[in-house]
């Protein structure tokens, strides 16, 4: 074990050479500065996220002055006890949320009456009953004094993922919203969407999650698709008309900040990538990022890696061999070989293309034909670009594009199926594309796994790799195959959905828990790897199971 004083000295040294990195946000306590660096690098908390979620007892200026006095008084020879006392004197672990039961919660939604299988019906009801345990509302004190917290306060109650994720997250919310709508909780969904829209109005985009230290990045752009789910379920055109401009604003963030040129066969295309320009460690994983970057001596190399780490976090896949690029374009290496920003992700562009389509339809319905035309033109451009850049005719599937080597990354990832899920292709080709995708899936030996579809075939120890199966990835593949129009693909989707529901039910019966990810080799067993222990709850897991039950187990 490294002696505490040596850890402190290391912390001070690293800070001196890292001071020029762009911060994660403006806060000199939660996102940048010596206080954050010393506390996180001293490892007085096992989880880096713990410190940046503490409440500041005083205002920021007083807290920083107290820290300067602390450094002077201890003459930079502080002990662990000294630092822990400083933190306890200036910060407080406080629940930022109050108990809240959604007013529209019912333990007997209409979905249950359409499920014939008694076992599946009971499972669905058990999942519905979990929603109140994941329901949160921000305390009035946080709303009144937000400067003392890292939380981004919102007015309405919401559903969290669960476990260490005590605030709402962007892309998790898509499958949570789907599950809530299937649970007849329309008001709760409207409140969650209003929360997101208020964030867009304030910041111009939706950050990774509801913390100031997430303001350096977003997550997969699914707001418009959440709105589509809500409007389809409620036909709430008054709400849509009121909020259409803000929905538009969120998509334009991606157009204005995440597009790059892609050259293939001499033709230039514009496509999106995940790209955070913040070249400093993630505050919630500060120690881990500094450690990962310690292999580099040049501060510019460290800053580049920090940007790639944050860009990978923006993708939602933090972390995966998907973003690791070796000298040959393969996936050999560790997180220090992360090159997220050279990769053009097929799923991101599929999500955007579908969002453009939905937004165009919204404008059309509301009678705003110029805006409807603007977005429908983008749909055609993106469909063509996805086909020309991402689709591999030899393999019958879409791939990420390596924008430096100008080649497909021909590895198995569930994201390869995202264009099927998003239906971002000429509808006349749906059946053949579904048939080809099903063939690709089978030739990759994916039917060998009864605990779910693996996130990759790489054994890296990262959580978005083998042997983990993630709920949203199951949804993208299963629902994509089912919507394709190919009979073979639809049959495959039904079997995969049956396996996933069965595996989740096994785990639920054994533990009473729903997990954020599962092990493909052992049906029902939770997954592992990554920077934290597996979490239970779990918002998107419950949403995906309810989605599959609704699609494949109802009359």
Curated annotation (Swiss-Prot):
Residues listed as glycosylation sites in the UniProt record: 46, 216, 334, 371
Localization terms from the record: Secreted
Keyword tRNA-binding among UniProt keywords: no
Gene Ontology cellular component terms for the protein in this record: extracellular region
Tissues where the protein occurs: Bean-shaped accessory glands (bags).
Enzyme nomenclature, EC number: 3.2.1.28
GO MF, any single term: alpha,alpha-trehalase activity
GO BP annotations, alphabetical order: trehalose catabolic process
Domain of life, per lineage: Eukaryota
Primary site of residence: secreted
Keywords: Glycoprotein, Glycosidase, Hydrolase, Secreted, Signal
SUPFAM superfamilies: Six-hairpin glycosidases (SSF48208)
Gene3D superfamilies attached to this UniProt entry: 1.50.10.10
Signal peptide range in chain numbering: 1-16
InterPro entries: 6-hairpin_glycosidase_sf, 6hp_glycosidase-like_sf, Glyco_hydro_37, Glyco_hydro_37_CS
Keyword DNA damage listed: no
Residues given in the record as substrate binding sites: 164, 171-172, 208, 217-219, 282-284, 316, 531
Induction statement: It is increased from 1 to 2 days after adult ecdysis, but decreased after 4 days. It is dependent on ecdysteroid hormone during pupal stage.
Residue numbers annotated as active site: 318 (proton donor/acceptor), 516 (proton donor/acceptor)
Catalytic activity: alpha,alpha-trehalose + H2O = alpha-D-glucose + beta-D-glucose
PANTHER family hit by this protein: TREHALASE (PTHR23403:SF1)
Family listed: Belongs to the glycosyl hydrolase 37 family.
Protein known as: Trehalase
């Amino acid at each position: 074990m490294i002696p505490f004083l040596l850890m402190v000295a290391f912390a001070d040294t690293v800070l001196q050479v890292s001071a020029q990195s762009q911060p994660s946000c403006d806060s000199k306590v939660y996102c940048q500065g010596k206080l954050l660096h010393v506390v996180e690098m001293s490892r007085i908390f096992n989880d880096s996220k713990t410190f940046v979620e503490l409440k500041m007892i005083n205002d920021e200026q007083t807290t920083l002055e107290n820290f300067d006095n602390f450094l002077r008084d201890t003459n930079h020879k502080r002990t662990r006890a000294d630092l822990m006392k400083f933190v306890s004197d200036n910060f407080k672990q406080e629940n930022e949320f109050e108990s809240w039961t959604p007013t529209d919660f019912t333990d007997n939604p209409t979905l249950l009456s359409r499920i014939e299988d008694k076992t599946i019906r009971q499972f669905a009801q058990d999942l519905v009953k979990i929603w109140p345990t994941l329901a949160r509302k921000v305390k009035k004190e946080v709303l009144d004094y937000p400067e003392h917290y890292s939380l981004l306060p919102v007015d309405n109650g919401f559903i969290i993922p669960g476990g260490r994720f005590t605030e709402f997250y962007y892309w998790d919310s898509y499958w949570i919203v789907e599950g809530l709508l299937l649970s007849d909780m329309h008001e709760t969904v409207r409140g969650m969407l209003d929360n997101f829209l208020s964030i867009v109005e304030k910041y111009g985009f939706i950050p990774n999650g509801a913390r100031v230290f997430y303001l350096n990045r977003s997550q997969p752009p699914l707001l418009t698709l959440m709105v589509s789910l809500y409007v389809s379920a409620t036909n709430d055109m008054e709400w849509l008309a009121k909020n259409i401009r803000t929905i538009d604003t969120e998509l334009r963030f991606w157009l204005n900040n995440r597009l790059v040129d892609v050259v293939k066969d001499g033709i230039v295309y514009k496509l999106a990538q995940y790209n955070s320009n913040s070249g400093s460690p993630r505050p919630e994983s500060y120690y881990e990022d500094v450690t990962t970057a310690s292999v580099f001596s040049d501060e510019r190399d460290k800053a580049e890696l920090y940007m790639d780490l944050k860009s990978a976090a923006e993708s939602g896949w933090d972390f995966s061999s998907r973003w690791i690029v070796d000298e040959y374009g393969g996936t050999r290496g560790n997180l220090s070989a992360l090159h997220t920003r050279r990769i053009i992700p097929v799923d991101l562009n599929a999500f955007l293309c579908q969002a453009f389509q939905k937004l165009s339809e919204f404008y059309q319905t509301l009678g705003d034909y110029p805006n409807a035309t603007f977005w429908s033109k983008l749909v055609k451009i993106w469909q063509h670009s996805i086909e020309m850049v991402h689709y591999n005719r030899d393999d019958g599937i879409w791939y990420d594009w390596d924008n430096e080597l100008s080649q497909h990354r021909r590895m198995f990832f569930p994201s390869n199926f995202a264009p099927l899920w998003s239906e971002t292709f000429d509808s006349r080709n749906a059946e053949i594309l579904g048939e080809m995708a099903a063939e690709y899936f089978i030739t990759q030996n994916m039917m060998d796994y009864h605990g779910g579809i693996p996130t990759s075939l790489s054994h890296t120890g990262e959580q978005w790799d083998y042997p983990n199966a993630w709920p949203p990835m199951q949804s993208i593949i299963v629902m994509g195959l089912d919507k394709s129009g190919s009979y073979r693909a639809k049959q495959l989707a039904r079997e995969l959905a049956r396996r996933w529901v069965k595996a989740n039910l096994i785990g639920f019966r054994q533990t009473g828990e729903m997990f954020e990810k599962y092990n493909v080799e052992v049906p029902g067993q939770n997954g592992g790897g990554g920077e934290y222990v597996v979490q239970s709850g779990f918002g998107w897991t419950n949403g995906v199971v309810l989605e599959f039950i609704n699609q494949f187990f109802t009359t």
